[in-house]
Amino acid sequence: MAQLEYKLVIVGGGGVGKSALTIQLIQNHFIDEYDPTIEDSYRKQVVIDEETCLLDILDTAGQEEYSAMRDQYMRTGQGFVMVYSITSRSSFDEINAFREQILRVKDKDTVPMVLAGNKCDLASERQVTTNEGQELARAFGCPFVETSAKARLNVEECFYGLVREIRKEVIGDKKGGGGKKKKLMGIDRCKLL
């Protein structure tokens, strides 16, 4: 049986810990220095729900000056981890723009996503409540998890949860629908005879 591969993309503002989460998952260690990412790709074989699969994770630039690159990697991603820092209100406020761009580029009403509030080990510096994260995820219709790359808290749950969301979409596509926007509502398509 062929091994399944999942193309995951991690998005969010600069400095929220996207690379730290990814490296913690892939290499089991925490990077504490901030070195802005332009784009890095990581691969790891894992077993999720008794199924061996390969995670192909694209760690993206959060800085606005790299926003032109986003459309390209959003086209190729099957699912997205949207990360904000619980210590940064502005990073939380940016999340909706990332989601809207993903939906626009994918030309779908729904795309597999997980919302992650990172740096939950810094509770004394919290600017975004857990409830606010839960409410936003509920509005998006996606899972929510608070993570800490430093403490390795909910790191696997975040990425594995996204794989489960992708699997749900694949099952939904087989049943019909697939979340694709309907462009020809009420118009009969041409038939070749």
Curated annotation (Swiss-Prot):
Belongs to the small GTPase superfamily. Ras family. GO terms for cellular component: plasma membrane. Residues 191-193 form a propeptide. This is Ras-like protein 2. The modification Cysteine methyl ester is found at residue 190. It comes from Physarum polycephalum. SUPFAM superfamilies: P-loop containing nucleoside triphosphate hydrolases (SSF52540). NCBIfam families: small_GTP. GTP binds at residues 12-19, 59-63, 118-121. Its EC number is 3.6.5.2. It is a lipid-anchor. The lineage of its organism: Eukaryota, Amoebozoa, Evosea, Eumycetozoa, Myxogastria. Pfam families: Ras. It is found in: Cell membrane. GO terms for biological process: signal transduction. Keywords: Cell membrane, GTP-binding, Hydrolase, Lipoprotein, Membrane, Methylation, Nucleotide-binding, Prenylation. A motif (Effector region) lies at residues 34-42. Its main location: membrane. A lipid is attached at residue 190 (S-geranylgeranyl cysteine). GO terms for molecular function: G protein activity; GTP binding.
